[in-house]
Amino acid sequence: MTLMERIQSINPKRIAWCCADYGITLDDLASDLSIAVASIERVMAREDGMTFNQLRKIAEYFGRGVLFFLETGPVDEAQVHTPQFRTLANQKPELSAKLKTLIERVEKQREVYLSLREDLDDADRPRFSPPVLPNDDLQEAARIARQWLGLNEQNSFDSYREALESRGVLVFRSNGYNGKWQIAKENPILGFSLYDQACAVIVVKKQEWETRQSFTLMHELGHLLLHKTSSIDDEGDLQSHRGHEREVNAFAGSLLVPDAFLTSISDAERPGDISQYDSWLERQRKA
């Protein structure tokens, strides 16, 4: 078969399922891939096929293999999406197609990492073995977690990230520029976590302020340690005063800035000029 020959054995129901899964129409698909709408409509009506290049573009768009669209029968969602993915999709049904693709890309990277770890001598490689935390005392939970991570008094996002990865949590930060690893600036999602007993994952959206990224990182860690579940969070979740979000917000705040750090602030030394507050609180801000 040459690249220009048309493949006739395409399963149109699988294209329809992918469009529904991504929340797009056939017109959207055609527009995004620069394929004539009429061509896709003929495929959906089983009146014509499409070239291998066209099918490959559709497969890459949905993050699937070409053979996925040649298989007969309906899609088994339990085989296509992991339980963690379905958890995130159920929490935020309005997730964009690009963000869903990013979640699946992160899952694939985790699979690659675990596969490499099996092939290599991984006896000394960190494994995710979280401490038992009290859910009824969030300050104590934060103290235990901070000790588990081995944090110093002053930290940055990179040192927090290194501490988590030393405990078997994979941490990704999205790109600030357009690309496959970007969470779009206009997208309200700030981060997500994938709970897995073998290898948990946290993804943090790149933001202007590093302190915001650090809070998002520890917010997601709270979901993993306190609730042992996957989660995806936006600005509203990181300011929520209800339920699990309230708990992980309190946990993240206490982990980043323990009460002992707050009591070390001397009000008598507070500068009269507000512009000097950054330098006055520099050590506490880098906790």
Where are each of the predicted segments found?
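Short juxta-domain linker segments that transition from a proline/glycine-rich
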Residues: M1-A287
